[in-house]
Amino acid sequence: IFAAYAFITQVFIIMISGLNVFKPYVVNSFLLAMGTFIVLALLYLVLTVLVAKFVTTKTAPKWMLSIGVVLILATVTGNIFALLLGISLIQKTRTKDASAIEKWQKLWQKILRNTMALHGLFFIVFMFSLSVVSSWTFDYDFATKNNYAELLQSPSLEYPLGTDDYGRDLFSRIVFGAQISLIVGFFATIIPGVVGGVLGAISGYYGKRTDNIIMRLLDVLYAIPGILL
């Protein structure tokens, strides 16, 4: 099912990115990116058939190991389903411990049985992938530069969601806004994790006194209202 959803996600990316052909011009990387997306979509479609034919719940042919590596590399486009499929194939071709594979299968079976959870996961992966590849297929100028000749345009093929009162393409603004939100969210998650890990390592290494000092400093920090921070 990962292969099928990787294919569907890629098709949606191609459809959304393809709307840029109706604009006056496209970015230099547009044709190369779209060609790559089409190749990946065909790969996922072929894999959907191959996985259904050759892969069982616990095993996969040895020759699928290289395909798993390619799928992991393809995750650079943000298609998390490709990553999950790649991990699953590598695990089934290399792992001899059936219990480890069963744990992985049970984890995803619980999610896949829940239709709403699966649809939510698809939407998240789609938005993530679109945010990742938007720099290759969308022109940033349409989202930021004022175009007074195109003020408040109604939705059309050229401007799927119309333009604002400065003539900027609302569709492009939403796509790049999602990209910025993704970057901010990523660093907002990573930085506290790194800082917390470093402080935890220091307190564990130097012992109780250092741990108490760090905890009291953090208590002072937590006492400050978040809006001031």
What role is predicted for each listed range?
Residues I1-Q10, I38-A52, G68-L71, A82, ...:
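N-terminal signal-anchor/first transmembrane alpha helix
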Residues F12-V26, V51-T56:
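Juxtamembrane "helix-exit" motif on the non-cytosolic side of transmembrane helices
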Residues P24-V27, L107-K110, T144-F186:
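Periplasmic/extracellular loop-to-transmembrane helix junction in inner-membrane transport proteins
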Residues N28-L42:
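Alpha-helical transmembrane segments of polytopic membrane proteins
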Residues A41-Y44, L170-Y205:
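Transmembrane alpha-helix signature in integral membrane proteins
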Residues F54-K58, V133-T137, F187-L218:
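Transmembrane-helix boundary motif in ABC transporter permease subunits
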Residues S66-S88:
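Hydrophobic, aromatic-rich membrane-embedded alpha-helical segments
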Residues T93, I214-L229:
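Generic hydrophobic transmembrane alpha-helix motif, especially the helices
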